[in-house]
Amino acid sequence: MKKEFLFACALGLSLTVQAKGHLDITSYRYAGPYLVSRPLLVDSTDVNAKAWSAASLLKTPLSLDAVGQAPVSDADKLPSAPAEGYALHLMQFDLENTAYGKAKFNVSEVKDWQLYVDGKLTDKQEMALEPGTHEVVLKYLSAPGESVKPKVSVDSDGEFSLHQGQSRLYTLADAMHGTKCAGVQVSPDGKYLIVTYLTSLKEGRSETVYCVKETLTGKEVARRSEAIRWMPLSGDYYFVRQGVSGRQLVSVSPATGFERVIAEGLPEGNFSISPAEDYLLYTLVQEGPKERQEIYEVIDPDDRQPGWRNRTYVAKYDLKSGLMQPLTFGYRNAWVSDISADGREALLMVSTHRMGKRPTTLFSVYRMDMQTLEVDTLVEEDGFISHALFAPDARQVLIQGSPEALGGVGMNVEKGQTPSMIDSQLFLMNVADRKVTPLTRTFNPSVRSVQWNLSDGQIYFTAENRDCYSLYRLDPSSGKITLLDVPEEMVLAFSLADKAPVMAFYGESAANSHRIYTMNLKKQKAELREDLSEKLLKGIRLGRCEDWNFVSSRGDTIYGRYYLPPYFDESKKYPMIVYYYGGCSPTSRNFDTLYPFHAYAAQGYVVYVVQPSGATGFGQRFSARHVNTFGDYVADDIIEGTKKFVNAHPYVNGKKIGCLGASYGGFMTQYLQTKTDIFAAAISHAGISDHTSYWGEGYWGYSYSEVSGANSYPWANPELFVDHSPLYNADKIHTPLLFLHGSVDTNVPVGESIQMYTALKLLGRETALVVVDGQNHHIRDYSRRILWQNTIFAWFAKWLQDDASWWNAMYPPKTL
């Protein structure tokens, strides 16, 4: 008996066996036979009045895992069915594809069978598969002594391949699933690590676990679902749990597992433990005045943001007495920035909100004596600082801020330039005389996270180093900064032992996911402790990722990189996707990202990622180009880079280039189309079309304009706000342009896409608008992210691969 199933597959990559039209599947992986027996018939029918039949044995649950590990063999070498008893058999083969198509699967020479595609049983006559390597398993039943050798063939109007290799294509599913590192903490003595693992599962479920491991051996000594951290003195780890009398603070010895309840009835809120473990410093929230829901007054532009009226304050909880002593009071936000190594002092920060002058938020830093509560003001209302740390002896304070902080002592820009408020610098203040020394004024990377190590007195920090997150050591006595040699391009987080020369960190690179390391700070050599990437990418073939830089017509070196398809053939022509942000930050070399570049490359694209003017990580003068330019410099760099890349790489089809950007990058997508016609398709996600409406309506519109449009306002600088807005240049756009937007985007409101889409429709231009319901600036919902990403894939397939089938399947043409 013959059964036929029609599958809509993505078909196109040539591997071992390739065909258009008809393909006989002549080789498989086989597992079996698995004997199954007729059950005891206690009745002649079941609860649905159906009699037992041998065909029901096909529904016997059977794991598909074994067949995936079996060797490949020819179809005519399948083993015969057992002479006695019924048996189940598994046959598996892989179909690989990079483009959307349709295929018809023909199964014959077997009566009872089931088909699984990518691990899921299908009984549909028609189904759609996305581009990738698809595991197809035929599960069939044989009767006693029956000679069964199924035949499978595929008919298609597209091109596809029978994949017989050990590697497969990287897909969106790979980007969305698996176990990643979400944090690493080294114990004070350096002997143990706390590693936080986040596992993303199918259907949007996730699981977080905290593991305590021996640093040298990797042996796991504890695993918990509660968040855990290290006690600073004892070296135990601690967590908070609900007890009979309220919240309990519990410490556990990693060596023995012995638990000790430190405090009962612990107040709610976030806290830090003092170095001597004698008190907790809380940052608590006081709720602000409420308004009626049906009608309400907005007292400040930021009052539209949920929780803006709430204020934080600081309190000290004495672990011996249980006394909670408020340390700050007022209507301004206050929080703990650091505690001195001896626990005698704390650095508190207070923010002041003002309208009428840039910057609209000011920060003060106070040094408070924890015994007397006496306060010393270190910094008073500076709008350009963000963080402060004590030196080990508390005689100096390390301050993090932008170049304009502390009177502009760290500025290093050209005359007429305003520094980027996103470009993060380090400053050293002597507490005794308040003398400030800029530590990174001529240091091009932009500081991210920083710690002052108690063990060796050195300052360690990560920084945006072009498109990498590099790890550095700074000697506070000499000011010398040293780049530490680590195996990863992106150091995502690090932790220092207080009493030993040990660092732990984790990172990733453009071609691998997370790996966890430790480093002996005396030897300065990183040692791999766990390779999560190896598990995530097992059996996956990635295309190459290479650096490609060019010298612009202005004389600047503009950095970039590109990704090639996994089965790249230099003799062929490939469409290309150009990706950029174009705003205040570079597009870093993360492997795990909302825009998985390897997944684009796996669909047959060359992907060029460019770092145009205005990004941090290249020096203050470079990042200052983001200020009061609204697309100038950036557009020139992207256009020039794209043209030069095509000229330098003959395998790129210069007539099939697409571009993609989000947020400020979405604005750049729109703005670019008013400047050039080199793109065959463009996509703007959550892009700004009118700087004035974004400035006034977005939650952070006016405050972000303090960065990008310093001291410029719509009424005072219409040339910047109007002439640089794509909406007022819509008639210049002729590129097919897709707008994507979350329906509840509070950062860049959805109206930014709607009004630009409306303009292009009125102009009769090729455009589309897709709104993702219930999503904000980023598309985080599991199922919606898949649809959103597939929309991007389908739009590019339509215009860059001349294949509209995927787009039409998702968004069928309508006659309205």
Regions found by a protein language model. Name each.
Residues 609-816:
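Active-site-proximal cap/loop segments of hydrolase catalytic domains
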Residues 101-114, 136:
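Aromatic-lined ligand-binding clefts that engage carbohydrates, nucleic acids, or primary amines
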Residues 130, 184-192, 228-238, 271-279, ...:
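Blade-terminus and WD-like Trp-Asp/Gly-His loop motifs, strongest in beta-propeller folds
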Residues 20-78, 135-169:
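Accessory carbohydrate-binding/adhesion or oligomerization-edge regions at the termini
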Residues 214-217, 253-257, 318-322, 369-373, ...:
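Short loop/turn segments that connect beta-strands within beta-propeller blades
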Residues 532-655, 662, 696-701:
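Cap/lid segment of the alpha/beta-hydrolase catalytic domain
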Residues 181-185, 192-197, 204, 281-285, ...:
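Non-catalytic accessory segments flanking enzyme active sites
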Residues 177-178, 197-209, 240-250, 263-269, ...:
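A flexible loop/linker signature enriched in serine peptidases of the S9 family
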